[in-house]
Structure formats: structure tokens, C-alpha cells
């Protein structure tokens, strides 16, 4: 079970297909009780993988006070919403009822990137407004089925940021959110140490695939898979 949870978490955390949605669906299929805090513990494994994978870029980015301030702004919406509606969000992980809707939303967002022309805006020059907007977008990824990487990268592409910068900023945004959720998960979850290890290893592979898809402008292709999972979750729900 730990092997399966870890691999699914690692692959789906960074591929724009929603790790929380997959774990909620798996929990339903296997008749297991996997809540939001337990998935957060798995996030700690993928947190290590993103830090290692993008270490040089993260180190360079954090030398800029503007980027640091923007990250704080981007983190506030999801952080505040997650604290205020903690119980309601956790309840969403106990049932696949809304998975078809949320997976479909992710599919549509990804598909729209196919028709979005590439931009030239740089992460170093991001305005506080853009930082807030992408932070609000990340807020919706608290719902299982809506991909955090998918919605943040897509939002930045819609705002005409370069693919490389959209990817890098999405990586940076994930660190405080995943770390905070993971710490809570250590207190309330029930996942052994093996699951985060498997999540770390599969997460490295997923990061490589995501990077190639964003740089080649083909992140939209994951929309087909999300639509498939939306249909599957509807059939089994």
C-alpha cells in the first residue's frame, strides 16, 4: 500500500493531473480512509524532490527580495482559506462525489493553454497583482481533482509569462504550501516513512516530464487524461 500511495503521489503531484484527486479516488476504490492530512505527509516526499530538482533555480530566485515578497503574497490566499475551511476541505477527501467536476475543471484549464500565445514576462518583474492572482488560483487546488501545478502554471501562461518562468514560480509556490500542510500531516496522519520515500523517487521523474511538456508548449495534452479520470470517477462514484 505504501508503494502504491508513494508512486501515485509522486507522479501526480507535479504532473498537472491532481495528486489529491487521485488519492481520493484510490481511497474510494480500495475502501480505505485517507484524509487530507495523510496526503499532506506524502507531500513531504515530493517537497524534497522539487527542492533537489530545481535547487539552482530556487537558490538564484531567493536572492531577490521582490520574488520573496511575491511568494508571500501568493501563499496568503491558500493559507488563509485552508485554515478557515479546514474541516470542510477535509470532508471533500472522504468522498469522490465532486471529483468528476474538479477533474473536468483541470482538463478545461489545461486545454485552454493550447490556445494561449507565449509571453515574455519574467518572474523577476512580477507585479504584486499578478502574484495575488496566481495565489488565488492556487487556492482552488485545495479541492481534490484540481491540479496545483496545472492551475498555477496555466494561470501564469495566461498572464503571458515565459514557460520557464511559469514553471519556476510554480515550483517556488509549492514549497511553503506543501511544507505547511506536511507538518500538520505529521501530527494527524497515519502514513509510514516508506510512502514519502516512494513519493520522492517518482516525483523526480514527474518533474522531468512536466519540465519538458511546459518548455515544449504541450502541457495541454494532459487535459485528455484529466477528462478520462473525470469520467472514471463519475462511473465509480
UniProtKB/Swiss-Prot annotation:
Localization in the cell: Cell inner membrane
Enzyme Commission numbers on file: 3.6.1.27
MF-aspect GO terms: undecaprenyl-diphosphatase activity
Chain segments annotated as transmembrane: 38-58, 65-85, 92-112, 126-146, 166-186, 191-211, 217-237
InterPro entries linked to this entry: UppP
Function: Catalyzes the dephosphorylation of undecaprenyl diphosphate (UPP). Confers resistance to bacitracin.
Family the UniProt entry places it in: Belongs to the UppP family.
Further comment: Bacitracin is thought to be involved in the inhibition of peptidoglycan synthesis by sequestering undecaprenyl diphosphate, thereby reducing the pool of lipid carrier available.
PANTHER family, A to Z: UNDECAPRENYL-DIPHOSPHATASE
Name recorded for this polypeptide: Undecaprenyl-diphosphatase
Species this protein is from: Thermotoga sp. (strain RQ2)
